[in-house]
Amino acid sequence: MFVIIGYIVCFGCIFGVYVLHGGNVQVILKALPFEIVTIMGGALGAFVVNNQPKVLKATMAAIPMALKGSKYTKERYMELMAMLYDILQKARKEGLMAIEKDVEAPHESEIFKKYPTVGSDHHVIEFTTDYLRMMVSGNLNSHEIESLMDNEIETHHQEAHAPVAALARLAGALPAFGIIAAVLGVVNTMGSVGQPPSVLGGMIGSALVGTFLGILLAYGVVEPLGGLVEQKTEDAAKELQCIKSTLLASMQGYNPATAIEFGRKVLFSSVRPTFTELEGHVKGKK
């Protein structure tokens, strides 16, 4: 919703002021189809050359996700920490071997089924169960598991930032393709120097539309979208850091109630539940 509002404000102010100053919108509309094909066609072709298929696929998936509202809400994090509390509480009361079935078949586990929002997210479940499995096996200490977690989160960070970097490169290329479109328009105009000034003026105006569109698409559309994708990737990484802090605290001997406090403290303040809110939510899920 806010993305749409932002684009409306951006385009509305730019074209609104242009019209208020007596600008002729017909000049832009007449040149628009040809300039768009030149600029976007060239930029997208370069975009394909510049990125591996996996990055292209990730970028195409990231854009629709960025346009949606964030799924990383306070309610989601409370559900995540309540789920971690339950699984750690079971391990504390009955022993680590008691959670082996939950870890090996999370989609059949009664604990994970209680929390459908995070339980249906395979990234969360895979990350959580992988390290719970290591805790059950007892082959690694907390420092070794922390190192593994850091490596996995760093890999996740690199993969998630590939679309961000790709969109940044696309935004950087669009003004240059706008200039190319403008130069082609000027070349076309120079071939018509015998035309009346009124005709030549229109042709030059159409050529300059290319430069205008290249800059507008770069800094008004693509670059802001890349920034939004980057913020969404930071939210995803923060969720993994929350799980990491909680599990490591448990391995270091803290009880489940204290362990989820470690996880709560790493969350961004805008979505971090208070101690009382989290405590009430956890008790309500028992």
Locate the predicted segments by residue.
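N-terminal start-of-chain detector that recognizes signal peptides
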Residues: M1, K71, G220-V221
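Alpha-helical transmembrane segments of integral membrane proteins
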Residues: F2-V9, F34-T38
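Helix-termination/interfacial motifs at the ends of transmembrane alpha-helices
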Residues: I5-I8, G12-V27, L148, E152-Q231
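Large intracellular
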Residues: V19-H161, A236-K286
